[in-house]
UniProtKB/Swiss-Prot annotation:
Stored NCBIfam families: pckA, PRK09344.1-2, PRK09344.1-3, PRK09344.1-4
Classification of source organism: Bacteria, Pseudomonadati, Pseudomonadota, Alphaproteobacteria, Hyphomicrobiales
GO molecular function: ATP binding; metal ion binding; phosphoenolpyruvate carboxykinase (ATP) activity
Signal peptide: none
InterPro entries found in the cross-reference section: PEP_carboxykinase_ATP (IPR001272), PEP_carboxykinase_C (IPR013035), PEP_carboxykinase_N (IPR008210), PEPCK_ATP_CS (IPR015994)
Gene Ontology biological-process entries: gluconeogenesis
Organism field: Rhodopseudomonas palustris (strain BisB18)
Keywords: ATP-binding, Cytoplasm, Decarboxylase, Gluconeogenesis, Lyase, Manganese, Metal-binding, Nucleotide-binding
Role: Involved in the gluconeogenesis. Catalyzes the conversion of oxaloacetate (OAA) to phosphoenolpyruvate (PEP) through direct phosphoryl transfer between the nucleoside triphosphate and OAA.
Cellular component aspect of the GO annotation: cytosol
Location within or outside the cell: Cytoplasm
Protein name: Phosphoenolpyruvate carboxykinase (ATP)
EC number: 4.1.1.49
Gene3D superfamilies recorded: 3.90.228.20, Phosphoenolpyruvate Carboxykinase, domain 1 (3.40.449.10), Phosphoenolpyruvate Carboxykinase, domain 2 (2.170.8.10)
Amino acid sequence: MQETGVRNGAYGADKFGLKNLKGVKWNLTAPHLYEDALRAGEGVLSGDGSLCVDTGIFTGRSPKDKYTVRDANTENTMWWGGNQSITAEQFENLYQDFLKHAEGMSLFAQDLYGGADPSFQIKTRVFTEMAWHSLFIRTLLRRPETAELASFVPELTIIDLASFRADPARHGCKSENVVAIDFTRKIVLIGGTQYAGEMKKSVFTTLNYYLPDKGVLPMHCSANVGPDGDTAIFFGLSGTGKTTLSADPNRTLIGDDEHGWGKDGVFNFEGGCYAKCIKLSAEAEPEIFAASNRFGAILENCVLDPITRKPDFNDGSKTENTRSAYPLESIPNASPTGRAGQPKNVVMLAADAFGVMPPIAKLSPAQAMYHFLSGYTAKVAGTERGVTEPTPVFSTCFGSPFLPRDPSVYGNMLRELIAKHGVDCWLVNTGWTGGMYGTGHRMPIKVTRALLTAALDGSLRNVEFKTDPYFGFAVPTALPGVPSEILDPVKTWADKAAFDTTARKLVAMFQKNFTQFEAQVDAEVRAAQPEAKLAAE
């Protein structure tokens, strides 16, 4: 077997059971992986030097094909209401079949860290069949110093074989595509898909399982910090604006998607960003645009001009879920440490497909826990298979697909941290205004940015608020530089009766969804939900 690259010679591929390989390329850097990917026909270069790839039939995650081993360790610790199980025997069959499938292959291996805080990071080794997958995970996780690689011993091992096809009868899955996690053995198997996001979300799911026991709240959020050291957290599902809104030229970016919150503050799980780039423009998102159009970036499923090889970010013909992966250092004001102090503000982003929520509202601590557990947003087109237009959904903790433990574990931790550190909480609608999806339009990003700036610099605390008659949270009545009518959603609708009907419908949806959590929260949180009389009238 031919091996190249820097590695721990005493802890190689054989420790994972891989044998009869043609070779392993260890910890290659971006130039090497570009060359390997291009030689293998995995992608092409854009006119600006990005590596452009297609992910095939899977242009998003496939949560229905994700499984966790149910054993003595996970039986009573997993949230089985939100996760699918397979037996240890089925996983072992899958594992052995992965090893067999890999025989004769030349694999790529990366040794990386999940987590910027050394006290809580997980050492992760990722084997991939495709060169661009190796570049992707190297870009998205945190890279050790070269000197650390010689003694690197992984705690978590991932093997991603895109050409593998699972056997539902033998492996306990539903299709040929599979993502299987064994928390006891700390192994993740990914097969049948070229969508690289499955790798990063498997690391996230693993950290979500282990960190609560260490006193750290894992979060599906972005984070940044102001010049005065004021940290802000942005919760939200894919496509709601986490990446866009945290990339603020006046604030230091901690990270765009996954963080932990513990006794010393906030830390990024990752070393890169994975931004949606449909309709990306230099005018609206200059930092992300520049980071996406340079050497080292990976563009997924973007359409290129056949002559200039420039990407057309407005073309969603392959998928609405076009993506750009780039290292954090491509953002000029990104934090090199990936760490910051205790948050001063928590922002919950909701892409309200009904168009009845205000662009910003202030939440009490009880309301914050209520909306965190509710996780209202819209599944935005193309983020997951089978979703072609925004659909209103409730995704608890703004990340239901990634929660291995009961949502109340994360909800209670959030409430305790908010109370302990006196954090201000805000709900921000990045979805629709002037009507529901199909008749209204997306909230202007300039309005959202202006409101967020006012919230984060403290000036929004000094304006007049009124109580929203449907949802009960506090809504500002005016803010300099923002049209006052957009602050009150009913004023943006031509048909006021239709607004009232739609708002009551959404209130009822909130109430129905929250019944699953009522037994796990106290009276104060139960009282924070939209008032029942509005839906009943």
